[in-house]
């Protein structure tokens, strides 16, 4: 009888963002007759943590350092390595599965353990500019398997890595969405509702979203963003501009639970993605599944998902042009079953089967 492989997943926090939700779905779906699973989080308090299966071993890797830690480091002790050793001594993994390029630095510790390594890349070019060159060198030299989230990422890495690369097409958990939508809350009021979702950041185009809202100040259209504020200057500036009343028909909803999130999504008349760059774009897929047409800027990933069955990709980022596209789509009807069929090629169960084969062979 074959021995089960022990996989230790590393990820940021299991909050409800695209990369974290994909990782959660993988952890939840892997065949327990083939794999034992542990997960290491860099931060506590993730929204998905309470929903982890009971058989998952949960660890926290402290990423901050006290004054005493810094003194020990200057005396020659590798504090982070010792923290990893404590986790590894308890779990005794065969594979480290590292989620997102931000955590690629963990690959430098692999030489201290008898493990294989996987790195799951959800990011695209903009994100690579934000990390050190050493992280890419580690990806190339130290990852036994690199897993990309879309064909866009595949184009970046396939020729470079050869058989060390595979694409795991990101997909949404439609069964979970269905459970969240068993009770539908009717939309209040008669305003047209335009929704966006994701971290309130420059890459996601929050500034474009806000500028667009001003074209509808004297209409019955409201703009709602579902997402959390990061702690940076860009977010702080725009948060204060909203508080000052510059964007009167914009709401930021950052405290919704999962059911409230999907109900808000389904209650929209249009989903608006203003992203400057996406490697995929799961929130657009969620909107389409909920029967909400999508207007998306040409972010890369949007062209993989959005078509004339479910919305439109706009190749002009100017708010004047986008505002006209919004008006056009608000007056156009879409058929929900055709919308869902338009994204049916993104099959999460099939992707899990492919991933299990890779993990079994590594």
PLM features: residue spans?
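Short alpha-helical donor nucleotide-sugar binding micro-motif in glycosyltransferases
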Residues: 255-256, 263-268
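Carbohydrate-associated surface elements
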Residues: 152, 171
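Glycosyltransferase donor-sugar binding loop
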Residues: 40-46, 197, 222-236, 254
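Short, structured helix-loop element that forms part of the nucleotide-activated donor/catalytic region
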Residues: 50-51, 224-248, 260
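A conserved mid-protein helix/loop that constitutes part of the nucleotide-sugar donor-binding site
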Residues: 20-25, 201-215
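Aromatic "clamp/platform" in nucleotide-sugar-dependent glycosyltransferases that forms part
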Residues: 276
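Conserved acidic donor-binding segment of nucleotide-sugar-dependent glycosyltransferases
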Residues: 308, 312-319, 328-333
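Short hydrophobic beta-strand element within catalytic cores of glycosyltransferases
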Residues: 284, 293-296
